[in-house]
């Protein structure tokens, strides 16, 4: 077995699992009556208190799923950091990751007329 799989330090923690970790951290903070900025969204500046709580308690968190039985979150600190502090907006991050995988995007970006009108664009028949 490769050494990275043995020490459970591979980046197998998904974005959904990090978001679930976020939700559990918010619930724990609420349960302990530490409610400062717990309603802030992950991408807002006010979310720093929840992010600090997660960073401070990484060694206590575990994720249990079928793909990895002993995933302590502290081994995935790079993945957690990338998710909590994105360097770009999610649309551009997705475009970059899909382009890296497929070498060219498999979808078309919505034209500017769509963003102004807030209605889906349709192709003429």
UniProtKB/Swiss-Prot annotation:
InterPro entries: Baculo_LEF-11. Keywords: Transcription, Transcription regulation. One of its GO terms (biological process) is viral life cycle. Pfam families: Baculo_LEF-11. The keyword Transcription regulation applies. Involved in late/very late gene activation. Belongs to the baculoviridae LEF-11 family. This is Late expression factor 11. It comes from Orgyia pseudotsugata multicapsid polyhedrosis virus (OpMNPV). The gene is LEF-11.
